[in-house]
């Protein structure tokens, strides 16, 4: 949207180069505005700019909603360090991620119900072309934790406000920032009960400790 590009240009972080500005502009312009604007190529590029490695994108519909299926590459294992500690969007990411595009303002309850009724069985992402306030997100989290906490796949919601915030981040910081801003409002358990292998990302930030283990 033009207003978002104008905001970005007026609030460009100090030290940004022309390349940073162009990257942010492209990220903003790939955002879907209205059902007719959704196309697979734009969604694929949007998620590549967000920090995923998307091989291809297929557009579809579920009920009355526009969806896209991303075929993605998971993060490599045994790296020296990771950008974030969330394995389902890293080394344990599935080969396909569903993206749902919703348009128009709705209450927190309506938003959750509209997403849940689509019957998606694995973690997915909602792009909401509307604005969520802090109160909206808290209401959304409360409804998820108390009413939709059994048998429902986790999903992350990116609204226009968050999308603009992400545009103002450098490209390698967008995915970690998105997870930090969305995971508190959904159900996700990064830990496993009992014994078992630990995802590489769980050593996030512990570079020296991880190096010492590998050198043993």
Language model feature labels by segment:
Residues 101-103, 201-202:
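Short, flexible loop segments at the rims of nucleotide/cofactor-binding pockets, characterized by
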Residues 1-92:
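Extended, compositionally biased accessory segments flanking or bridging domains
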Residues 59-75, 85-86, 94-98, 120-182:
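Charged, structured surface patches that assemble and position nucleic-acid processing machinery
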Residues 105-116:
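A short, acidic, amphipathic alpha-helical segment used as a generic capping/interface helix at domain edges
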Residues 102-105, 130:
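Residues immediately flanking
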Residues 90-91, 115-118:
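A general structural signal for short secondary-structure junctions and capping/turn motifs
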Residues 172-205, 209:
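Conserved adenine-nucleotide phosphate-binding loops and their immediately adjacent elements
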Residues 211-215:
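Phosphate-binding P-loop
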């Amino acid at each position: 949207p033009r207003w978002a590009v104008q905001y970005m240009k007026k609030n460009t972080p100090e030290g940004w180069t022309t390349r940073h500005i162009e990257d942010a502009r492209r990220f903003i312009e790939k955002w879907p505005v209205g059902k007719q604007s959704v196309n697979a190529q734009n969604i694929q590029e949007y998620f590549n700019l967000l920090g995923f490695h998307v091989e291809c994108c297929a557009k579809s519909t579920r009920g009355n909603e526009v969806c896209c299926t991303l075929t993605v590459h998971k993060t490599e294992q045994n790296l020296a360090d990771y950008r974030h500690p969330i394995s389902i969007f890293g080394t344990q990411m599935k080969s396909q991620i569903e993206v749902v595009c919703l348009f128009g303002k709705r209450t927190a309850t309506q938003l959750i119900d509209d997403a849940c009724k689509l019957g998606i069985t694995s973690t997915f992402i909602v792009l909401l072309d509307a604005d969520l306030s802090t109160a909206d997100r808290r209401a959304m989290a409360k409804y998820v934790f108390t009413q939709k906490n059994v048998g429902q796949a986790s999903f992350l919601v990116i609204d226009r406000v968050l999308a603009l915030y992400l545009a103002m981040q450098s490209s390698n910081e967008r995915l970690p920032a998105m997870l930090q801003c969305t995971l508190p409002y959904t159900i996700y358990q990064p830990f496993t009960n009992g014994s078992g292998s630990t995802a590489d990302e769980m050593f996030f930030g512990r570079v020296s400790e991880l190096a010492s283990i590998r050198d043993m």
